[in-house]
Amino acid sequence: MRVNAQHKNARISAQKARLVADLIRGKDVAQALNILAFSPKKGAELIKKVLESAIANAEHNNGADIDELKVVTIFVDKGPSLKRFQARAKGRGNRIEKQTCHINVTVGN
């Protein structure tokens, strides 16, 4: 049994979120939640919410036992960029791209 959860258009770059995702891949969910709780990175908070959602989905929809669940797969894909304008000197302007990503977590036993 495998259960998915995803967060689309998360306001963090995929590269930064992948650093946190690599920490919990293949671990059991209790250990993964503990790692994320003590990680100082912004991505840890976002991934923790998605992982908790996947655990709740498994418990509610399939009646799964939380103690037996593991993080089967976790991957972070690049999302659409938000294009913004930043004023510069002498009437010029630069484009600022604010990166987003899609976080996908699959838990199972």
UniProtKB/Swiss-Prot annotation:
GO terms for cellular component: cytosolic large ribosomal subunit. The keyword rRNA-binding applies. GO terms for molecular function: rRNA binding; structural constituent of ribosome. GO terms for biological process: translation. Keywords: Ribonucleoprotein, Ribosomal protein, RNA-binding, rRNA-binding. Pfam families: Ribosomal_L22. InterPro entries: Ribosomal_uL22, Ribosomal_uL22_bac/chlpt-type, Ribosomal_uL22_bac/org-type, Ribosomal_uL22_CS, Ribosomal_uL22_sf. CDD domains: Ribosomal_L22. Gene3D superfamilies: Ribosomal protein L22/L17. Belongs to the universal ribosomal protein uL22 family. Part of the 50S ribosomal subunit. Present in outer membrane vesicle formulations which are used as vaccines in human. This protein binds specifically to 23S rRNA; its binding is stimulated by other ribosomal proteins, e.g. L4, L17, and L20. It is important during the early stages of 50S assembly. It makes multiple contacts with different domains of the 23S rRNA in the assembled 50S subunit and ribosome. This is Large ribosomal subunit protein uL22. It comes from Neisseria meningitidis serogroup B (strain ATCC BAA-335 / MC58). The lineage of its organism: Bacteria, Pseudomonadati, Pseudomonadota, Betaproteobacteria, Neisseriales. The gene is rplV.
